Amino acid sequence: MANKFETIEAANRTEFGKGSARRARVAGLVPAVVYGADMESNLHITLNHRDFAGLVRRNGVNAVMELDVEGVKQLAMIKHIDQNVLTFNIDHVDLLAITRGEKVEVEIPVIVEGQPAPNTMFVQDADTIRVEADALNIPEEIVVSIEGMELGSQITAGDIKLDDDMTLVDDAELLIANVVLPAVEEAPAEDEEGESEGESEA
């Protein structure tokens, strides 16, 4: 659980537009915006790209951090990361300002582990589930096991055991994973084989 959070330094942005954002990225910075219900206006900042990317690697895409914006502290969590589709560099970040004890809705990755019954396989239908959780207590992932499950068995969102301080937001019937028969590769039709043999003899 994310009971602890890291501090990351930020600076106020004074320039806006595509040109200024491009210059910031060239300088190793990530443009970001911080918003929240209790904020009078959005806060536009820049983050150190290396520091922020490291925070995401260590804490996941729902990471909570303490922003130090030129000496002013603010708790925030990641809401959206805009990545370049070619370089995968982080182009822009949306951050939600939060307070201790606040509940937030987040999508948490679901990891399926284990092996179903022999001669079956599992299909994962949903990679995430949406829950409401304490902003400072969000798990990086939720693990479900399909170990030994028989053909036709299913796991729905409602089957997943959540911590006491978490509430499922998704439909309880949302299908997460199910056990099916492996796909069978069809053999070539006999007449096609015969035609091939006849052609080769000719």
UniProtKB/Swiss-Prot annotation:
GO CC aspect terms: cytosolic large ribosomal subunit
Keywords (A to Z) from UniProt: Ribonucleoprotein, Ribosomal protein, RNA-binding, rRNA-binding
Database matches in Pfam families: Ribosomal_L25p, Ribosomal_TL5_C
NCBIfam families: bL25_bact_ctc, PRK05618.2-1
Family: Belongs to the bacterial ribosomal protein bL25 family. CTC subfamily.
Database matches in PANTHER family: RIBOSOMAL PROTEIN L25/GLN-TRNA SYNTHETASE, ANTI-CODON-BINDING DOMAIN-CONTAINING PROTEIN, RIBOSOMAL PROTEIN L25_GLN-TRNA SYNTHETASE, ANTI-CODON-BINDING DOMAIN-CONTAINING PROTEIN
Protein's name in the database: Large ribosomal subunit protein bL25
Organism field: Corynebacterium efficiens (strain DSM 44549 / YS-314 / AJ 12310 / JCM 11189 / NBRC 100395)
Lineage: Bacteria, Bacillati, Actinomycetota, Actinomycetes, Mycobacteriales
